[in-house]
UniProtKB/Swiss-Prot annotation:
Known EC number: 2.7.4.3
UniProt-annotated binding residues for AMP: 31, 36, 57-59, 85-88, 92, 139, 150
Family (UniProt): Belongs to the adenylate kinase family.
Record's GO cellular component terms: cytoplasm
Pathway: Purine metabolism; AMP biosynthesis via salvage pathway; AMP from ADP: step 1/1
Catalysed conversion reaction: AMP + ATP = 2 ADP
Renumbered residue ranges of the record's region LID: 126-142
Assembly and binders: Monomer.
Keywords: ATP-binding, Cytoplasm, Kinase, Nucleotide biosynthesis, Nucleotide-binding, Transferase
Originating species: Methylobacterium radiotolerans (strain ATCC 27329 / DSM 1819 / JCM 2831 / NBRC 15690 / NCIMB 10815 / 0-1)
GO molecular function, one term: adenylate kinase activity
Record function comment: Catalyzes the reversible transfer of the terminal phosphate group between ATP and AMP. Plays an important role in cellular energy homeostasis and in adenine nucleotide metabolism.
Matching Pfam families: ADK
Name of the encoding gene: adk
Name this protein carries in UniProt: Adenylate kinase
Amino acid sequence: MRIILLGPPGAGKGTQSERIVQRFGIPQLSTGDMLRAAVAAGTPVGLEAKAVMESGGLVSDRIVVGIVADRIEEPDARRGFILDGFPRTVAQAEALGEMLASKGLSLSAVVELKVDENALVGRIEKRAAETLARGQAVRKDDTPEVFKQRLEAYRAQTAPLSAYYAQKGTLETVDGMQPIDKVTADLMAVLEPHEERVAS
């Protein structure tokens, strides 16, 4: 089962990804972790990434897709994986699709956690106020201002992925504003039919 979980910052992707990993026994593949591991291992693609990072450049989509391609060949990913932090753009989604197709694979499901962005901002503001009320400092990345910037970046860059996968017929949506356990139950209901197709 090959899964992508989409949703804005604060939607609960981290929590739900952990539960998917536990339920289906597939690894969560974080592009950041994979990059660091490839660099440390000195793989051809890792060496290429290292040179780019050391020069202060951004690692290209081609390099990231190459790292994902290497990682999914490892034994623990044979039954599938959940991608974390990738793809972030439609161009990356297209490159990922081409790479999987070249291996005779495809995505099982792309699930978007749908949330009310105003409610998310409200949650962050409430959390910041509670932290201040306890006499503690609010972490810079937990301030409502920074959170709003992250939401805007998501809307501009990553939100178009929903339309891209919807057009391909692979997008499923789950209401991310529900209690955490209800979100998990809805996610499992969406994902479990794909598990049977893989097993048969």
